[in-house]
Amino acid sequence: MEQTKALNALEPFIVLSKSATSPRAAADLVTRVTSAPNTFIFTELLQTPQIQSLEYSHEFSSYLTLLQIFSHGTYADYIANASALPALNDDQKLKLRQLSLLTLVANDGSNVPLDYDAMQRENNQAQPPNQSYASLTRRLELSSARELEELVISAIYAGLIEGQLDPANEMVQINSVAALRDVPARGVNGLLSSLQGWAGRCQATLQELEATMANLRDEADRRATEEQEWNNKMSQLLEDEQKGAVPSSSSSSLPFSWFNNTRGGGGGGDGAGAGGSFRGSGYSRGGGLSQGYRSSQRGSHQQHQNQSRQQQNHHHHHQSNQSGTNSLLTSGGGSYLSFREGPSAVSPSAAAGLMGSSTSFAALGGMETGSGSGSGPLGKRGSSDMDDSEEDIDDDTMDLDDEGDETKRGSKRKLTA
């Protein structure tokens, strides 16, 4: 913004330079432009042919040197060549001292023209160093601290610097400086170096950002691939589980096999499920105590089936008990061992009432074991076969009764005859 104001203030003098056809007119233009307020840059005016022609004028060539000092020199440069230069009015002295203050604080107090080291320090986020009253008063050819304070205040209002005065410590605290000094020819190389360094830092920053973005994209792709593989595995596992699931609605549809080894006697047992337990014992006509244990993967469902079968077995025991016992399985005595896997407990050997000891194996889905002597609970086949046996006994009894009646009637006929 300050540069725009300075360029706008210089523009009228550039237009006037076109009409300054004589060295005197050009020299007068130099005096006016260096005395005008808000004109702090003069390069464009220096490059005009009319101003450059002053170099060949023996009488007015000093005005060209004076304009060059205002462009990129200091007040000390003017004092060093004051005898060969035109005298300065009060406005010119104030302006040259303001520009010199800008150069001094920007260049760390060294009495050299501004070469845009301030730009480099701004890029490095460094503040110009503070200046003492004594140093600035001496370099700017001022007579008192009061004059220095007035100069600093005018430079702050002109937008050349930002800072504060510290009268107690006699220090000028500089916060920032404006780029309102022209670049001399000898300062171009330094400016190019600063710009190249700034461009290099920008390029390095861009490369780091691109590398970081590439790493983030690779990481995102890797995570997406892992997630897709995981989803595929889970889908395949679910599909395999559905295809390989065993239906449990009906036990008759499952594979079923028996292996029996009978060595006399009969046996039985009871059951214990995952959801609870049931234990019982009974005596048959052959004598003996049966006790068994059952484990099942079906929990309370198996327990319910065991209790139902136990009730059925007690019912059949009551019907077929002929010796005062409360359960009937097989006739005879011996030992019985049964291993069974499946949702139901059916022991063919116990149901059939085989003589001797019996060992049975069944493979289906759960597991049942039983051991003991004497009798245990009947399965469906046992109860069915026992009912058939009872019916046969009843038929035989009825046949004997019929034969007895027939014998009585025959004897009675003989006596009558």
Swiss-Prot record:
<dbReference type="Pfam" id="PF22061">
    <property type="entry name" value="CSN7_HB_subdom"/>
</dbReference>
<keyword id="KW-0736">Signalosome</keyword>
<feature type="compositionally biased region" description="Low complexity">
    <location>
        <begin position="343"/>
        <end position="352"/>
    </location>
</feature>
<feature type="compositionally biased region" description="Gly residues">
    <location>
        <begin position="263"/>
        <end position="290"/>
    </location>
</feature>
<dbReference type="InterPro" id="IPR000717">
    <property type="entry name" value="PCI_dom"/>
</dbReference>
<protein>
    <recommendedName>
        <fullName>COP9 signalosome complex subunit 7a</fullName>
    </recommendedName>
</protein>
<dbReference type="GO" id="GO:0005737">
    <property type="term" value="C:cytoplasm"/>
</dbReference>
<dbReference type="InterPro" id="IPR045237">
    <property type="entry name" value="COPS7/eIF3m"/>
</dbReference>
<feature type="compositionally biased region" description="Low complexity">
    <location>
        <begin position="320"/>
        <end position="330"/>
    </location>
</feature>
<comment type="function">
    <text>Component of the COP9 signalosome (CSN) complex that acts as an regulator of the ubiquitin (Ubl) conjugation pathway by mediating the deneddylation of the cullin subunit of SCF-type E3 ubiquitin-protein ligase complexes. The CSN complex is involved in the regulation of the circadian clock through its control of the stability of the SCF(FWD1) complex.</text>
</comment>
<dbReference type="Pfam" id="PF01399">
    <property type="entry name" value="PCI"/>
</dbReference>
<feature type="compositionally biased region" description="Acidic residues">
    <location>
        <begin position="385"/>
        <end position="405"/>
    </location>
</feature>
<feature type="compositionally biased region" description="Gly residues">
    <location>
        <begin position="367"/>
        <end position="379"/>
    </location>
</feature>
<feature type="region of interest" description="Disordered">
    <location>
        <begin position="240"/>
        <end position="417"/>
    </location>
</feature>
<feature type="domain" description="PCI">
    <location>
        <begin position="2"/>
        <end position="179"/>
    </location>
</feature>
<feature type="compositionally biased region" description="Low complexity">
    <location>
        <begin position="291"/>
        <end position="311"/>
    </location>
</feature>
<keyword id="KW-0963">Cytoplasm</keyword>
<comment type="similarity">
    <text>Belongs to the CSN7/EIF3M family. CSN7 subfamily.</text>
</comment>
<comment type="subunit">
    <text>Component of the COP9 signalosome (CSN) complex.</text>
</comment>
<dbReference type="GO" id="GO:0008180">
    <property type="term" value="C:COP9 signalosome"/>
</dbReference>
<keyword id="KW-0539">Nucleus</keyword>
